[in-house]
């Protein structure tokens, strides 16, 4: 069937300082076990800057570690705390739970949490950062300046902890991840159907072929939960600093970091830390690191320098997912986070409601999790154009007619219809997406129409304003 979505005001102008970006919470409903052995279905919303677990009908939950139960939350000043009432699915609630829920306003609680999340994100966003001019894409709307055309050197460090190591069947994590990142047509029993290099080569129409260098594993001296510890619901920045510094110092014994300063500006363009265990975005491990992309010299105290170059941006994601913990996770989170490195922003909703966003159609939204992260969708026409991978074919209103819209993945073609009088800041993009190749697990197929309204004020607040 034809599947059509219209996104209005979705993409905000990205002309401000680079943001700290994070993977979205896995919003798919999942069952979690209560202390008495029963199960409740929950959903998680948000990102690194703020997230909340809820019932499927929207009531915020609090996990009480002392009882081992998810309990209905109540608001205490600015934070959630337990009401003491054990949560259950709507059809299984007792009278006490039903009466309690009549007395609370989940909308009011979520509104307060959204304000806090926005404030935290704003602090991360506006600190000054190092920025340099690099060749490649036109950089117009991107939040970073990493080369998106050619074959830049990319450093990936495998990182494990004193109590959490990589769990590969053959005992060779380095060999496994070299294959996952670089082997053409990579397959594995977790459902993998292509390598990271395959993904970016396809999405860029052959214009971007990064040289992935995988090293490690290096083992940090402290525990998994130490580095993933939270403060006010977010990863502690001092522990993240130890995580990055420790990993880079350990890797410096075998790595020449100057190789990864692709333009010679004195900064490593990016260090990717692939860490053992789980991440907080798609699991219930609260004391684990949430996958994210930060700038080290922006958010950490002091600089970090090796081989005459400083560590600039870094990115990280986990080995395992909370959905299938017995197998290595797919490439979806890496492709999402590395797309931040290239300069793309998050396109998922930053609030705790059911805002209409690209969802599974976009790797910068919930497409990260398609086919359990094994088959992220290729980048949209808009994203490709911003990265220098696609040139729009312009249509003139009232003058041009099209009868065939070529499939995006196969043709790398899309149409643009400018809105008169907006000086190129507002336009429609038409693309044809079919459920083949990397797009096999899209929720639908046919034409996607994107209404791009580039607004710096919207981006400043990190909001997706969607009108249908």
Summary of predicted features, one role per range:
Residues 1-7:
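Bacterial N-terminal signal peptides that target proteins for export
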Residues 203, 270-442, 450-457:
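Extracellular hydrolytic enzyme modules, especially secreted metalloproteases
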Residues 466-468:
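Conserved small/polar residues in nucleotide/adenosyl-binding loops
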Residues 21-143, 393, 397, 420:
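N-terminal prosegments of processed precursors
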Residues 130-180, 230-237, 277:
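Fold-level signature of zinc-dependent metallopeptidase catalytic domains
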Residues 135-148, 191-307:
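Active-site-proximal segments of metallohydrolase catalytic domains
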